[in-house]
């Protein structure tokens, strides 16, 4: 007798009075459906391009407050960079490398067919940046059914200009028709601590050249053990004996807590289904006084009004708030990390925690002269706050007037308002009179897609499907910013309490209208061809150039359908695609744009003043010369790949090669100041991204009770800047980082440029004959921004009801500049600065250039190791702070037990799972001292990478999870 079931392997058994049969999953016979562009559902075998999918269960294995972090290491070609260890912090995402010079290369996010915002607005690029997260972090992971990553232009062409850098298509969970009501509870409690702390020396006090100086926050003073019989003045003015406090930095950080709780109710009747969900995320950070709270309510409901007319609504409301998120970067009075890492080894962290303010309410600074803020003054007095309200929702109506014809309209909106406030209490070093700044942000996206689809099968062998559609997309952005200075009453942060206020308001609007079409042909379920085309009209481009068309063609061939013997190779597909897409630019770059000014400079008086002036507000003209002849950016994409399945699916191999060429970049080039402008927008530049992606799945062992699955991903992308503007060999993407610049240089990938050590032909350091220190040379390429390759290896072991899995995340290549390490070394606090301190004749290995042009071995000792490190690790000597950013990490661990359902037969409980979960647990190998090599100063809205600038240290988390279905 044969026993079969959909999606399971058929088994033949001998007939007995009592049979117990366990059917195994049959991944070969189960038709996998993938959600692609415009929400079109296609069979996986029909796709002529690479699509990677992650199920919702994979995302919630070890939940993160930002869902993007859960994708790290799981998808080939997808690179995630977490910006900091701040609670609710942001993460940038990139697919197949950076393709643009003038704009951020970030994929489009889609939820249930609606494009949503993933911005991360930050008014400053380097000064006092507070990481407030990116908008994709608002998405609740418990509501996600699946995430499909569309990588190539052929996969995303129907979305138009917005998806030139790929698309992340999210499908949310729904109820089921004719299903009883289920209540599901998912609760996690996590503990969080700093992943990696600096290695400090604990032998020397603060000072200079071995002499104690309480005014200095460093480690260049006397050896502590040699002055035990002496007393010195501390930061409070008390006489003390010097003593090392090895854990003063470690003890500053707290154990963060994270509570993520979700309750959902789902079910359905004969004509309707529904799912309601509520999630609360409550976090306290490792930085004292920092917290993040997010509350998300979602609904997804569908209704069959008639046999041929249906409707579905999907909506999410998110409310989040935070307090005490610390500032990062430079040049800001509220910076914490330089203060904490810069603590002299003699300072007791518990002492300054108890003595940050005197009885008169005045700050007790870290030095008697009041030049360094007490970190606990910043934590208690200068709290950054923000709150956000966001609504994402769409309504989809579907009508089927005749057999084979489907008409769908999907209308939706994504809008949010956010308020931020940064404060500096009176008495703060750098802002003694007190000040504050507020932002009121508003973003709204409106999108409507009307589509008509017709499909028909001919002669049983041919299947034809055609779709035409129309899209209207509009987004609005507003920013109301007020700077208030010189407070009358301390800690009263109202505009009327400030002697000077400077309002700066800005708004912009953009509209895109498009028409598109899609034709699919299939023959005998083994040969598939898909052709798409889209034409967009953009409001941000000149009238003559605002219309642009981009086509795509893709195909797949299931060659194993022609094979008789499939014992070894069960399934084989070859796929091929080509696409050409265009994109526009930001609004208001075609004409003269005047923006509000907050300050003005009186040349002859040499003073800076603020607006309003004598009751009049000020405006300034554009810095960039408008260009009315701009054309759309253009990208051509070619992709070829194969999907193979061996031995009944026990070996699964997907391979892809791609080549993306992006030209007509819209960039700003410098122009003579005599023109009255700083730059001019032009079409120029050509960037190539070529690479390979491999996904390998193995099931090495599978028995009745035990199964081992191994899934590995590999991706390598080579970026090359093939062309820039005429006469231009390099273009600065980002600067203002202690002389370091991120540049696009002709013939290279995006790289780090700055001051390097001068070398002879053999690579030896050239040493200054007077100081014994290395000589420097400017504007040298110091390293690549992006890695050579990335890998992820995920192992899952299942034994009866026990599941154990762990994910290894690998990055090879790329460089990292660290300002944190520069500060640690130049201040004499890093452990490695102990070497040769007592050696008065340390000679740096290298050569000295002689008068006749020849070199001789260096024989000049440095004056002291203080001079050596303050030169070698000086932030302006960039090469001294560049490191190999490669790493191997234990990214994720999960252990869970599913209690047998038979235990609950007489109860209302349908299922119960208990588990242990951990994220970012261990840096197995890296080449960067003191900090996490994954540290990234650039957020999702910035171009560049490979830079760490006084960032909040990253964290590891571990805890417990309970899942219950009633």
Where are the regions that the model predicts?
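Short, small/polar-rich motifs associated with maturation and membrane association
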Residues: 1-298, 304-306, 310-312, 316-318, ...
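Short aromatic-centered micro-motifs
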Residues: 3, 109, 521, 759, ...
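Extracellular/periplasmic, surface-exposed regions of secreted and cell-surface proteins
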Residues: 59, 106, 221, 259, ...
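Conserved small-residue
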Residues: 184-239, 589-590, 603, 682, ...
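Extracytoplasmic gating/loop element in the C-terminal half of outer-membrane beta-barrel translocons
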Residues: 234-238, 249, 538, 813-913, ...
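Acidic/polar loop-and-plug regions of large Gram-negative outer-membrane beta-barrel proteins
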Residues: 239-240, 318, 323-390, 443, ...
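Glycine-rich, aromatic-lined ligand/substrate-binding cores of catalytic
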Residues: 784-819
